[in-house]
Amino acid sequence: MEQSHQNLQSQFFIEHILQILPHRYPMLLIDRVVELEANRKIVAYKNITFNEDVFNGHFPNKPIFPGVLIVEGMAQTGGFLAFTSLWGFDPEIAKTKIVYFMTIDKVKFRIPVTPGDRLEYHLEVLKHKGMIWQVGGTAQVDGKVVAEAELKAMIAERE
């Protein structure tokens, strides 16, 4: 049953994120949610460190965090917003659901992300109907937009 969780807490730490999202190392790309308004918007971040495995090959002498992983982090953030908007913080329901990426539109990469950056994801709900959610927003470092995108996802039963 779809419902709205307007009184949801606004901050979530890694132990909370791990209970809602199925992603794990090295593909969990959110460290903390710092702002969440159900059905409206979310702000989360990932600290980028030189210890990321991806820097072994992207690129050894000039480490740049891959754009596709920035978009994946935005998608995970949007998925967290969609799930918690529908069911609140409910780890038991999270075990039965999965968010599938459907489309990526209007992606632009503006500034490289490098070790030491705090990559913030700022997303807002563009529209949703049932289990289909469309979100859009930016990835930022120090208040500067490094990437932007619109994403569509579907929440389904995990089998």
From Swiss-Prot:
UniProt keyword list: Cytoplasm, Lipid A biosynthesis, Lipid biosynthesis, Lipid metabolism, Lyase
Name of the protein in question: 3-hydroxyacyl-[acyl-carrier-protein] dehydratase FabZ
Q: Which Pfam families match?
A: FabA
Q: Which gene encodes it?
A: fabZ
Q: Tell me, what does this protein do in biology? A: Involved in unsaturated fatty acids biosynthesis. Catalyzes the dehydration of short chain beta-hydroxyacyl-ACPs and long chain saturated and unsaturated beta-hydroxyacyl-ACPs.
- Root EC class: lyase
The annotated active site, in chain numbering, is 58
Q: What is its EC number?
A: 4.2.1.59
CDD domains named among the record's database cross-references: FabZ
Q: Where in the cell is it found?
A: Cytoplasm
A GO BP annotation: fatty acid biosynthetic process
GO CC terms in record? cytoplasm; membrane
The answer, when asked if Lipid metabolism is one of the entry's keywords, is: yes
Keyword Transmembrane tagged: no
| Xref: SUPFAM superfamilies | Thioesterase/thiol ester dehydrase-isomerase
